[in-house]
């Protein structure tokens, strides 16, 4: 395990993307969002993605420095084509569009199509919450067959994230952000690179056997080699049986089919689609009841007596706040295999040995 200071990690990852044709501004933006995912404890959406992103750039699956385009524009609705730009570039544009429309109309919807990997969806809910807005996000990943629907063994769904953000007055927002599978694909990636092990039965093999071995999804792999989910015989399982499977299906239809990205299928270019709704609570809540009631109910939930083995009952966003404070203070821990893969990628794009050494100093 190697632990890297937050600013060092951002600087190093930004240098990797700068060496791969991203502008300095885009490179730092990508690095900051990826590192922020690590800070919140979501290592699956953090810097472990660097080798994948660079591989996608080399194969033309993602385009550096892309300018998204608004292709449908009404007072309360927009469709944004990301043109396969990095998600960390095109998604903020789409979210800002939704925020601006919502502040004028009180309610807005924005469909983002053809985006590169948009990272931790909670970032975009937090962005809206910082402007005082509630947001709901339905996301799919076209070209990313990973998850077996309830009762099946074959990959038919993406991990299809769902996210809700609720602003608080003078406090961090409440953010619920989860893949509709038992684990996100990035969690399998983390486990395959020496990180946290998968929950029992998170995967299902072609014969219906439940497993927690990453090779079920990726097939055989070497410690610092690539991971390819098309090579494994199995799939990730949907969470909550028919409920998670059903929600994933809806995310595919709204985040994928309705946005124009397309519901996921094999043999096509990867792209995230996101349908996001934005609501200004001040338009609805003219008596300022909303935030007071959130405070009351949040306290009511947290005061629940925990079962044996559980320290305390939490609400969405609590684990991320705790982890962010800890890692901001102590640095970001990365398994040796994860760091080795990132360093190998850095060398491939021409980052100097001095920069590599400086990252861990």
Question: How does the language model describe each region?
Answer:
Residues 197-263:
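Secondary-shell segments that build the walls of catalytic and ion/ligand-binding clefts
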Residues 70-77, 81, 93-108, 212-232:
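Residues forming anionic-ligand binding surfaces in small-molecule and nucleic-acid pockets
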Residues 78-169, 175-181:
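A generic, well-ordered mixed alpha/beta core segment in the N-terminal half of proteins
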Residues 45-101:
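Active-site cofactor/substrate anionic-group-binding motifs, chiefly glycine-
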Residues 147-223:
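Phosphate/diphosphate-binding glycine-rich loops and adjacent basic-rich segments that engage nucleotide
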Residues 3-12, 19, 258, 263-361:
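Catalytic-core signal marking the mid-to-C-terminal active-site face
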